[in-house]
Amino acid sequence: MSEHDQNPGDWSDCFTIESGGESGGEPGVVVLRVHVQPRAGRPGVVGRHGDALKIRVAAPPVDGRANAAVVELVARLAGVSRSSVAVVGGRRSRAKRVRIDGVGPATLSAAIAAAVASRP
């Protein structure tokens, strides 16, 4: 059994805290590591991919459409506006770093756990 299986609600290894939010609940700036599968038949949060969150988007990786879909999905997941989310690394790669403003680490971890638990 891996350490992730022992505490499936802890997703803190998938992101880093850039500012604020050190106490866990207060909003701050978080950078989430994601592994993206473009052109997916069923978009959504999948689970872990190493130390990243694996997500699927329907958009193709052409003209930034997959990145825009990632921003929309992560904003919905974190409960923030799309303007609070930006791809800051890996724009041309499946492995991306996504900056989220205005979300606490505990809130983000709980949202990820709920999304993974509710997937079919």
Predicted feature locations:
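Contiguous, often N-terminal, cationic amphipathic patches that form binding interfaces
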Residues: 1-72, 77-80, 86-120
